[in-house]
Swiss-Prot record:
The lineage of its organism: Bacteria, Pseudomonadati, Pseudomonadota, Gammaproteobacteria, Cellvibrionales. Its EC number is 3.6.5.n1. Residues 5-187 form the tr-type G domain. Coiled coil: none annotated. This is Elongation factor 4. It comes from Cellvibrio japonicus (strain Ueda107) (Pseudomonas fluorescens subsp. cellulosa). GO terms for biological process: positive regulation of translation. It catalyses: GTP + H2O = GDP + phosphate + H(+). InterPro entries: EF-4, EFG_III/V, EFG_V-like, LepA_C_sf, LepA_CTD, LepA_IV, P-loop_NTPase, Small_GTP-bd.
Length: 599
């Protein structure tokens, strides 16, 4: 095995679409990790969803052997990281296992807010950051301008930055040479008691829990007895190895290496991410500093369409939580939708991804309510409570003060789109804190209510800036605000799953818009359906879905039986997506109407 001075652990920091996964592909090709026949684009993005959306969601790892120009062979452990703002937690975990990071910037587009945020995380964790200018093959590449931008915005000297094109393969070996030269080797003692950090875990139906670990001290061998510090239950190591990117079984993993461990753990919570693994005979080894547990920012109710799926839904969530430590869930029941779970997510993209993974990987049919953020409420008795579900909001009389979460949003935008972005932030009740011109870009800092950010802010920001603005935000504080609960009544019955918490100044406008939207989405019945929006006891908007006249002539006379069967099946599939609320069927689209309101 390689000695410590020849190991390099690194990850790549890049904004979405700046070519991170393609660089990974080139590294694998240069180092011969896969034969040309097995090579495919974005080989590390193994989830179908990742390929379809063209984003990296999960962190992946690869171990490659690179023969450098100095004639020595180096073991490169590369941990791939996602670039989207919702997955920053995955990034901080990957960085915790590295000594260096490549900051990849698109030579045509320049620096984006997300790379700035992740780059600061890397610098705070003491990593060596190496700037790389990618996409040099593009005619619109401006390396000198972008190098200056990296220096202005992040403060890294990028005059010597490697210039490469992952697509054409130009300059990729120079990137590897820089990596070997600049990233420090890991420190650690192979003979010390074992300490290994769990970077990621996932559930395999045959092997049980598989964990990706970075060995910090000591050596991990096959048939060793190991324990996870927080659980303390001893397990036998059945298999360990590295991904090249195919799994390669090894006899041992030494200090400084990154690889996977299988220890026959069948319990989903048997290997929590961020925990320390050590030998059963040295249980009092110091735990490694993991990463802070992240708090969900957005909550939504998820309910199985058929109540028979409740147990399989619970299992699916448990397996997903193992793989995605930032997902939170607790049981919840709704008068309208029955039993389900209240789930917490890092942002809207995270929520969509989780919903799609549940529906695809676990074959569940789900109804999701509109997402809300967490509010802090001081009751008349002086107690402080947190509410993440509008239907759990106490009676207005017993509330002393309501506070909403405020986020600090850092936006990078080209100068010509600055006006539109400022207009959007003001419309979303934002307060400008800072504005700096750096080259052709402007860095704006705003304080915005999180409630406004999580719904459609990201999409609107992209559309007003023609896709050029980038956003990074983090929670700042709770701030008092005039908030009210907007209830939706259908035929006089409150539908708890449709309630919203909104700002008082916007409540009437929101009520009217919501009612109009619902009117278009609720199918016509055999009777008039009244849709009302109310605040407390006061109705602020009303609309009526007119009754339908039954068409008695549209019956099939005789004809082919399979034709009738087809029509019945089609109707059955449509009914499945609906839920009976009192006596009106509400389609899934109506639950999401809330998101489409122009506040």
């Amino acid at each position: 095995m390689t000695d410590l001075s020849h190991i390099r652990n690194f990850s790549i920091i890049a904004h979405i679409d700046h070519g991170k996964s393609t660089i990974a592909d080139r590294f694998i090709q240069i180092c011969g990790g896969l034969s040309d026949r097995e090579m495919e684009a974005q080989v590390l993005d193994s989830m179908d969803l990742e390929r379809e959306r063209g984003i990296t969601i999960k962190a992946h790892s690869v171990t490659l052997n690179y023969k450098a120009r100095d004639g020595k062979t180096y073991q490169l452990n590369f941990i791939d990281t996602p670039g989207h703002v919702d997955f920053t937690y995955e990034v901080s975990r990957s960085l915790a296992a590295c000594e260096g990071a490549l900051l990849v910037v698109d030579a045509a587009q320049g620096v984006e807010a997300q790379s700035v945020a992740n780059c600061y995380t890397a610098i705070e964790q003491g990593l060596e950051v190496i700037p790389v200018l990618n996409k040099m093959d593009l005619p619109q590449a401006e390396p000198d301008r972008v190098a200056q931008e990296i220096e202005d915005i992040i403060g890294l000297d990028a005059t010597e930055a490697v210039r490469c094109s992952a697509k054409s393969g130009l300059g990729m070996e120079d990137v590897l040479e820089e990596l070997v030269r600049l990233v420090p080797p890991p420190t650690g003692d192979v003979g010390a008691p074992l300490q290994a950090l769990i970077i990621d875990s996932w559930f395999d139906n045959y092997l049980g829990v598989v964990s990706l670990v970075r060995v910090v001290q000591g050596t991990l061998r096959l048939k060793d007895k190991i324990i996870a510090k927080t659980i303390g239950k001893s397990q036998l190591v059945d298999g360990l190895g590295v991904f090249t990117p195919k799994p390669l079984q090894l006899k041992e993993l030494k200090a400084g290496e990154v690889g996977f461990v299988v220890a026959g753990i069948k319990d989903i919570h048997g290997a929590p991410v961020g925990d320390t693994i050590t030998h059963a005979q040295t249980p009092d080894v110091e735990a490694l500093a993991g990463f802070q547990k992240i708090k969900p920012q957005v909550y939504a109710g998820m309910f199985p369409v058929s109540s028979d799926d409740f147990e399989s839904f619970r299992e699916a969530l448990a397996k997903l939580t193992l793989n995605d430590a930032s997902l939170f869930y607790e049981p919840e029941s709704s008068d309208a939708l029955g039993f389900g779970f209240r789930c917490g997510f890092l942002g809207m993209l995270h929520m969509e991804i989780i919903q799609e993974r549940l529906e695809r990987e676990y074959d569940l049919d789900l109804i999701t309510t509109a997402p809300t953020v967490v509010y802090e409420i001081e009751t008349a008795k002086g107690e402080t409570i947190f509410v993440d579900n509008p239907s759990k909001l106490p009676d207005p009389g017993s509330i002393n003060e309501m506070r909403e979460p405020i986020v600090e949003a850092n936006i990078l935008v080209p100068q010509e789109h600055l006006g539109n972005v400022i207009t959007l932030c003001v419309e979303k009740r934002g307060v400008q804190k800072d504005l700096q011109f750096t080259g052709s870009q402007v860095a704006v800092r705003y304080e915005l209510p999180m409630n406004e950010v999580v719904t459609d802010f990201f999409d609107r920001l992209k559309s007003v800036s023609r896709g050029f603005a980038s956003l990074d935000y983090n929670f700042l504080r709770f701030q008092p605000a005039k908030l009210v609960r907007l209830d939706v009544l259908i035929n006089g019955d409150k539908v708890d799953a449709l309630a919203l918490i909104v700002h008082r100044d916007k409540s009437q406008h929101m009520g009217r818009q919501l009612v109009e939207k619902m009117k278009d989405l609720i199918p016509r019945q055999m009777f008039d359906v009244a849709i009302q929006a109310a605040i407390g006891g006061q109705v602020v908007a009303r609309s009526t879905v007119k009754a339908l006249r039954k068409d008695v002539l549209a019956k099939c006379y005789g004809g082919d039986a399979t034709r009738k069967k087809k029509l019945l099946e089609k109707q059955k599939a449509g009914k499945k997506r609906m839920k009976q609320v009192g006596n009106v069927e509400i389609p899934q689209a109506a639950f999401f109407a809330v998101l489409k309101i122009d506040s």
